Amino acid sequence: IIFNDDQIDHTTGLLMLREGCPHQIYCTKEVNEELNTTFPLMKMLKHWDGGGTFWHEIIPNSTTNFEIPVMPSYEFYAHSLISNAPPYSAYRDKPRKGDNIGVTVVNKKTGKRLFYLPGLGVLEEHILEEMAKADILLLEGTLWTNDEMIKGNFSKKLGTEMGHIPLNGEEGLIKVLDTLEKPRKILIHINNTNPILDESTLEYKELISHGIEISYDGMSIEI
């Protein structure tokens, strides 16, 4: 199990897997710290068979890969992302380098690369370079516009304040994805407020016209 961050919606599922303990958890030291203190999932799971979880540290931006023994045909690389820490965290609005990561998965046999980015607040140069090398991009499509949550009276914050670059606009992700010729582009982490979820909308049709896909439950991806 790889945790890219310690957001509640990304980590709470571990509790549903409690009867399968112990689990091998791969995450940064920053995420592990939060999951043992302010959101203590790791401590809670110690009460189940096998001692709960075993932590393996991920070091972002390392020049060497990390491997997972049960997946010997693949190697993994972690990249720090500028996004945000969870609302419960003391590091909210002042995230550390290891609070959010993207992960590249490489098939050793084919050389194909998948880059997984569930939260993007800023597009740094090292992230753009990695995106350009990927064969498949799985990246966040949380919001269509930056003020979507404000206009819908769901929040008082812009998407970028929450750590999410919107899809639309001059500085949106669509503009960036249009510059990348190599990868297949698939959106994940799509908020319920995002109009692209409705196939009858102009926003959905515009997205598809740019060659960008929307992920779905049960989707199978090979590299």
Residue ranges and their predicted role:
Residues 23-31, 138, 187-188:
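Short internal beta-strands
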Residues 31-36, 64, 146, 193-197, ...:
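Short, charged/polar "capping" segments at the starts of alpha-helices
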Residues 11-17, 35-38, 127:
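Hydrophobic packing residues within well-ordered alpha-helices of enzyme cores
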Residues 52-55, 76, 212:
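Generic structural signal for residues in well-ordered beta-strands
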Residues 57-130, 217-223:
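Core dinuclear metal-dependent hydrolase active-site scaffold
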Residues 21-24, 31-66, 82:
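Acidic/polar short surface loop at catalytic or gating sites that assists cofactor/ion binding
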